[in-house]
């Protein structure tokens, strides 16, 4: 290793290192000179001597350690509010290590006069601190409070000599403490004699230095003893306070703890539970009655850090009561990480999560960044993400218990000992579109519902109850169109029996299979009605075979499904179908409590211009009466009016009876559970809580979707969007239409439904369409006068539809127009090159003959030589008889040149083509 490499290793300039080597007596003249281990040793010795590392009095090694500790205190102001204040404590300690060889020489020199003089123990007092290194190293141990009395009490000279030679042993072994004032007073004259006797060996400066060192060491040992004692008592107080906190937390979690008693004076809101017990543990001289006597002194006293204060300082330290200022602010850092159990609700902000873990919000944001999420301090996190973050930061995350207003519903939801009575069966009629479901119900009800539906197809759930000679049956008629999957699923959820209508001349179709799956998923028995058996091409046996393939086996083939052949048009075997339904209902033994608060399900909901929100309910248990307070999902309200399916006013509805109610605060979601609550305050509280919870969950999901689909969104610049605002008469209608429109989207064009709702088209809808350049679609609704006027003046397109097919077809046509056209090449002519002219300023001109088709200026051209395409470009100029022409037809000669290409030879063939754009369709 040379000087330059050594300097790089020491991170010093090479010239400075050369100067230091020369000063140390090592002859090095250049940075490339080699450096040996001996040279390094010489340099090290020189540097030690220069910086006080030599022997004698300069042989002392001093180490100064500065410690900075940060704690927190909670301070109560005059208003009773509690604040957290940061407290910083700084300590500086100097440790001195002396040369063991010098100490041994001094000890031997002092041994001779010590043996001769009877009053020699004081030198032991001077000599014991002479080796402070091992004592300092053991200072933090709690067993050393009695070190200083041991040295003072040694009466005989023999222990003194032993103490000097093996200094650490008597320091730790002395068991009995003794007051230090009297021995110090007696030892003073002896020290003077000792100095005279040792004058021949030690000079007076050394003796004085050792005396000062002994006094400093004595004071240090006293401080260490006091620190150790205070630390033990503080630890006991801390554990006691921690146990009290844990007990308080447990009591709060179980909601069983009584509220804390009020403090006798103000500004004591956060007192520990047992301050008197903590003071009583100190000693009998402390009076328990004085725990609150001098409260003003407590408020004026020292601050309490998180690690605790002096043991006799109570909850807040008093002036003059602690041993030293350092003891009050001593902070004991935790030796192991604190693992907290964090209860995470369904949604939580980053700031709240950081507060629960007692960390700064920046730490939580860093952890989320490491997980790939860029968040802010007010970002809402969903429960799953928050638990992952908690576990990532070393704590235990658990989903929070339901401490919500909805817990009231769980408590009140259990039915009591209400009497159970038989209830009518709820029958859902399902099947493929145009298989005759509604016509079959018409025949049963002897009405004409199907003819009133737009296009002859059902687009809503119709709920009716029919009183037959054999009993009451409630029917739910669901749409068969593929767009109404969600509506059919709701029908299956609320039903007891599913009647599957299959046309005998059509067979099993996709919606028939879907209805079977819905019934099986809901665990509902099936009754198959084979309709249209009066048609000539009806084949009931084929229907049975196709249904067996789908897992529906008729009873006559050994299965458990009843098959009934009916004709809605000819009114054939309708009573047989009703008998089959009632037989299945008897097997199910359907019962429900007739008394008590009603419960049910929202079948359909709409916004009526005159009546407001209107919901169709199916009561499942209890009795719904006019004036009841109803809660349905996020909406609530008092039942102002109740109508049956015929539009007649009724005052109450029992189990399995469908009714229309008015008086809700908003249009509820179809499929929501409905229940009656005792008071409006509780209903409003739960509804508002659900609204906020839904909003937070949607926001958290949207944020998660944004993060997950970041890469997917990068390529969406080329995708065309058709913005649509959708308004419908019923909630199920816009659900079905939105589903159907979403299915026709492709990778190039997408339908973007920016707003959908129930009710007429209003002025705000037109303004939204104007701002977002959207198309307004009204399904079975119309625009009001102000909206119509605004739409005409602003040019907003409003489309009205009554049949779902028409709406889907027109939107599909609009999307087809947004597709990028397909480009195709069409060859329009062929040209043969017969002569080539080279003109310096123009380039190569080809004299050609048009053999086929036509040549147009600006058309694309391919140059073919020996049946190989040499060049593809476009015509630059086209002339005939020195005149520029637009086109030259077959069997005529012309002159032409190609753009940016001159390699034309006689005999080449030019193929002329045009690019034609062809419209695409979905």
UniProtKB/Swiss-Prot annotation:
Residue intervals of the tr-type G domain: 422-589
Family, per entry: Belongs to the TRAFAC class translation factor GTPase superfamily. Classic translation factor GTPase family. IF-2 subfamily.
Residue numbers spanned by region G4: 531-534
Pfam name, any one: GTP_EFTU_D2
PROSITE patterns in alphabetical order: G_TR_2, IF2
Function summary: One of the essential components for the initiation of protein synthesis. Protects formylmethionyl-tRNA from spontaneous hydrolysis and promotes its binding to the 30S ribosomal subunits. Also involved in the hydrolysis of GTP during the formation of the 70S ribosomal complex.
Region (G2): 456-460
Keyword GTP-binding found: yes
Upper classification of the organism: Bacteria, Pseudomonadati, Pseudomonadota, Betaproteobacteria, Nitrosomonadales
Protein name: Translation initiation factor IF-2
Localization annotation: Cytoplasm
């Amino acid at each position: 290793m040379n000087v330059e490499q050594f300097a790089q290793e020491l991170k010093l300039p090479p010239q400075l290192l050369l100067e230091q080597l020369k000063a140390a007596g090592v002859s090095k003249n250049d940075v490339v000179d080699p450096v040996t281990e001996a040279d390094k040793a010489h340099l090290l010795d020189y540097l030690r001597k220069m910086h006080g590392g030599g022997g004698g009095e300069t042989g002392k090694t001093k180490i100064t350690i500065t410690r900075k500790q940060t704690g927190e205190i909670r301070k109560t102001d005059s208003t009773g509010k509690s604040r957290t204040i940061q407290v910083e404590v700084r300590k500086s300690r100097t440790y001195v290590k002396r040369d063991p060889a010098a100490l041994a020489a001094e000890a031997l020199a002092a041994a001779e006069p010590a043996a001769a003089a009877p009053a020699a123990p004081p030198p032991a007092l001077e000599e014991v601190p002479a080796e402070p290194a091992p004592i300092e190293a053991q200072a933090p141990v709690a067993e050393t409070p009695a070190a200083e009395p041991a040295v003072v009490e040694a009466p005989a000279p023999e222990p003194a000599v032993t103490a000097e030679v093996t200094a650490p042993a008597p320091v730790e072994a002395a068991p009995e403490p003794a007051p230090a004032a009297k021995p110090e007073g007696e030892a003073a004259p002896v020290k003077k004699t000792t100095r005279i006797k040792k004058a021949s060996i030690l000079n007076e400066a050394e003796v004085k230095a050792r005396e000062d060192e002994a006094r400093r060491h004595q004071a240090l040992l006293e401080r260490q003893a006091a620190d150790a004692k205070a630390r033990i008592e503080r630890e006991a107080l801390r554990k006691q306070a921690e146990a009290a906190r844990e007990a308080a937390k447990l009591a709060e979690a179980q909601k069983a703890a009584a509220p804390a008693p009020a403090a006798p004076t103000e500004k004591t809101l956060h007192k520990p539970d047992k301050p008197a017990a903590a003071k009583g543990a100190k000693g009998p001289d402390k009076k328990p009655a004085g725990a609150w006597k001098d409260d003003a002194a407590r408020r004026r006293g020292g601050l309490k850090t998180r690690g605790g204060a002096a043991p006799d300082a109570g909850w807040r330290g008093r002036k003059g009561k602690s041993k030293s200022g350092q003891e009050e602010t001593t902070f004991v850092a935790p030796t192991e990480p604190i693992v907290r159990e964090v209860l995470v609700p369904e949604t939580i902000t980053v700031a709240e999560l950081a507060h629960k873990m007692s960390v700064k919000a920046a730490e939580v944001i860093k952890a989320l960044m490491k997980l790939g999420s860029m968040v802010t301090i007010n970002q809402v996190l969903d429960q799953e993400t928050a638990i992952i973050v908690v576990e990532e930061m070393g704590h235990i995350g658990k989903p929070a218990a339901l401490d919500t207003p909805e817990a009231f519903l769980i408590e009140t939801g259990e039915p009591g000992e209400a009497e159970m009575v038989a209830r009518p069966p709820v029958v859902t009629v399902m099947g493929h579109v145009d298989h005759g479901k509604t016509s079959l119900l018409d025949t049963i009800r002897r009405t004409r519902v199907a003819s009133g539906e737009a296009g002859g197809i059902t687009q809503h759930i119709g709920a009716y109850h029919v009183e037959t000679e054999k009993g009451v049956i409630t029917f739910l008629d669901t749409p068969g169109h593929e767009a109404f999957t969600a509506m059919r699923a709701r029908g299956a959820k609320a039903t007891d029996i599913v009647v599957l209508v299959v046309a005998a001349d059509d067979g099993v179709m996709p919606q028939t299979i879907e209805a079977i799956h819905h019934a099986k998923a809901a665990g509902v028995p099936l009754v198959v009605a084979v309709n249209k058996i009066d048609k000539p091409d009806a084949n009931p046996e084929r229907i049975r075979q196709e249904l067996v393939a789908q897992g529906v086996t008729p009873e006559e083939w050994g299965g458990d499904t009843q098959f009934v052949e009916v004709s809605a048009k000819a009114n054939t075997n309708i009573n047989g179908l009703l008998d089959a339904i009632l037989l299945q209902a008897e097997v199910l033994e359907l019962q429900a409590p007739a008394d008590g608060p009603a419960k049910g399900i929202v079948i359909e909901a709409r916004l009526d211009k005159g009546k407001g929100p209107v919901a169709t309910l199916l009561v499942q248990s209890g009795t719904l009466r006019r004036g009841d307070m109803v809660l349905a999902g996020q909406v609530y309200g008092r039942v102002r009016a109740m109508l049956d399916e015929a539009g007649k006013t009724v005052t109450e509805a029992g189990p399995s009876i469908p009714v229309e109610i008015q008086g809700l605060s908003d249009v509820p979601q179809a499929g929501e559970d409905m229940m009656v609550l005792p008071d409006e305050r509780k209903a409003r509280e739960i509804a508002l809580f659900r609204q906020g919870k839904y909003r937070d969950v949607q926001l958290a999901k949207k944020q998660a979707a944004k993060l997950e689909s970041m890469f997917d969104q990068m390529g969406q610049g080329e995708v065309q969007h058709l913005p649509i605002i959708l308004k419908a008469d019923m909630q199920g209608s816009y659900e079905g239409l939105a589903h159907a429109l979403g299915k026709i989207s492709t990778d190039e064009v997408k339908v973007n439904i920016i707003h959908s709702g129930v009710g007429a088209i209003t002025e705000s809808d037109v303004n939204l369409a104007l701002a977002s350049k959207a198309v307004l679609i009204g399904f079975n609704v119309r625009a009001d006068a102000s909206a119509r006027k605004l739409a005409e003046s602003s040019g907003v397109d409003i489309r009205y539809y009554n049949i779902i097919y028409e709406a889907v077809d027109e939107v599909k046509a609009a999307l087809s127009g947004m597709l990028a056209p397909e480009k195709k090449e069409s060859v329009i002519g062929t040209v043969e090159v017969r002569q080539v002219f080279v003109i310096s300023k123009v380039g190569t001109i080809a004299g050609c003959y048009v053999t086929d088709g036509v040549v147009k200026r600006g058309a694309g051209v391919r140059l073919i030589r020996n049946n190989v395409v040499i060049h593809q470009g476009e015509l630059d100029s086209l002339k005939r008889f020195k005149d520029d022409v637009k086109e030259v037809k077959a069997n005529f000669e012309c002159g032409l040149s190609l753009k940016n290409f001159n390699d034309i030879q006689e005999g080449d063939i030019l193929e002329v083509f045009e690019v034609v754009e062809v419209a695409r369709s979905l």
